[in-house]
Amino acid sequence: RGSXLTILPLRNKIDLFYVG
C-alpha cells in the first residue's frame, strides 16, 4: 500500500509515496 501522502482524485487514487 501507499505510505505517505495519498491523493484521491475524482476517479483515480495516486500514491505519491508508494512503498510495496
UniProtKB/Swiss-Prot annotation:
GO biological process: proteolysis
GO molecular function: aspartic-type endopeptidase activity
Family named by the database record: Belongs to the peptidase A1 family.
A GO cellular component entry from the record: extracellular region
Entry keywords, A to Z: Aspartyl protease, Glycoprotein, Hydrolase, Protease, Secreted
The name this protein goes by in its record: Pregnancy-associated glycoprotein 73B
EC number from the UniProt entry: 3.4.23.-
Keyword Secreted on entry: yes
Post-translational modifications: N-glycosylated.
Tissue-specific expression: Expressed in chorionic epithelium (trophectoderm).
Entry keyword Protease: yes
Subcellular location as annotated: Secreted, Extracellular space
